[in-house]
Amino acid sequence: EGLLHDAVCDIVGTQFRNLATVGGSIFGRFGFSDVMTAFLALDSYVELYKGGIVQMSEFVKMKRDNDILVRVIVKKCPGHFVYLSHRNTRTDFPVLTVAVSDCGGVKKAVIGARPGIAKLYEIERMDKETAERLAEEAPFQSNMRVSEAFCRHLAGLLLGRAFA
C-alpha cells in the first residue's frame, strides 16, 4: 500500500532527500521525522551495537547515547498500512504526520511531528470516534509554524482519513 514510499516521497526536497538515510532519521529520533512515524506503525526493531535488539516503540523513549545503530528490522506481516502528512508547503518539514496499521489484528495509530517525537497508540477500532479521542488525548505544542489547536484539528482529520 506504499506506507514507506508515502513517508519518504515528500522529504523536504530532492537535494535533502537524496542525502537522508533511514538509519539517520531513526537514530536521530527527530521530532519532524516522517520515517519514524512510519516505522512505529510497523512491527519494527533496531539493533544497537551495545544495546542489542530493541523494539522501535521502546527505542524512541530511550535516552540518546553514543551507541551505534547496526540495522533496522521490520517483521513481515500482511495487513493494511496508511501514512499521511500535512505540510505548509510541499518541500517543508511536516506540520503533522500520521501512520496507521492493521497487522494481524493489532491496530496501531502513530501521530508525529506534533512537534515532538512520534507517539504510538495501540487501538481497538479504526473509526471516527477513535480519531477524535486520539486527537484530544495526544500531547501537542504550538511552534512558529502551527498552533496547538490546529494540530489537534488536523490530527482528527488525518486519522479519520487514514481509518477510512
Identify what each model region corresponds to.
Residues 1-164:
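C-terminal structural segment of proteins
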